[in-house]
Amino acid sequence: MNIVLMGLPGAGKGTQADKIVEKYAIPHISTGDMFRAAIKEGTELGLQAKSFMDQGALVPDEVTIGIVRERLAKPDCEKGFLLDGFPRTVPQAEALDSILADLGKAIEHTLNIQVEKDELIARLSGRRICKTCGASYHLIFNPPAEEGKCDKDGGELYTRADDNPDTVANRLEVNMKQAQPLLDFYQAKGVLTNIDGQQDINKVFADLDALLQSSRS
């Protein structure tokens, strides 16, 4: 079962990824994890990636794709994998198809967790931090007992600059524009399924699970 998991920030992608890999016993492969593992193993591509990361530069596609190739060829991917954070562009998706073809595989499912923009803004801008102790709250998911005050020490709660609703909205707009060509690519290949991410976490997983189960039978 070879899966690409997509979704905008705040859609709950990480939560659902954890549930899928636990249920289906496949590796959860994120770009960051791949880079860290390649660097730790001291591979040639890992060292190349590190040199770019140390400079604060983006790792070029050819290095990233090489690391993906090495990762997907490992034995734990034999029965499938879940890719998270890769591919990000159509050229990367085309390179992924080429890698998988060499391995006698293909992407079977691209799962896109959809949440309305207003809901994403509410989720992402609801975080509040205590000025005194740094404790984190969320107005929707983990609100303080008393509005504006930390439960632990009564410290004032504040909103970080990058959690400001306008900043969040702008960030989402950029992400949406970047994601659309990739969604179109997988739609054209007939492997894209949009999942309603505004439901309860367990209901979202039930929908994902039903889809994956039906494709196995």
UniProtKB/Swiss-Prot annotation:
Gene name as annotated: adk
Gene3D superfamilies: P-loop containing nucleotide triphosphate hydrolases
This protein's record includes keyword Metal-binding: yes
Protein family: Belongs to the adenylate kinase family.
Pfam families: ADK, ADK_lid
GO BP terms: AMP salvage
Segments for region (LID): 126-163
CDD domains assigned to the protein according to its UniProt record, in alphabetical order: ADK
Reactions this protein catalyses: AMP + ATP = 2 ADP
Official protein name in the record: Adenylate kinase
NCBIfam families tied to this protein: adk (TIGR01351), PRK00279.1-2 (NF001380), PRK00279.1-3 (NF001381), PRK14527.1 (NF011100)
Positions bound to Zn(2+): C130, C133, C150, D153
Gene Ontology annotations for the cellular component aspect, listed alphabetically: cytoplasm
Predominant subcellular localization, coarse grouping: cytoplasm
Localization of this protein: Cytoplasm
Residues involved in ATP binding: G10, A11, G12, K13, G14, T15, R127, S136, Y137, Q199
Organismal lineage: Bacteria, Bacillati, Bacillota, Bacilli, Bacillales
EC number assigned by the record: 2.7.4.3
UniProt note: domains: Consists of three domains, a large central CORE domain and two small peripheral domains, NMPbind and LID, which undergo movements during catalysis. The LID domain closes over the site of phosphoryl transfer upon ATP binding. Assembling and dissambling the active center during each catalytic cycle provides an effective means to prevent ATP hydrolysis. Some bacteria have evolved a zinc-coordinating structure that stabilizes the LID domain.
Superkingdom assignment: Bacteria
Keywords: ATP-binding, Cytoplasm, Kinase, Metal-binding, Nucleotide biosynthesis, Nucleotide-binding, Transferase, Zinc
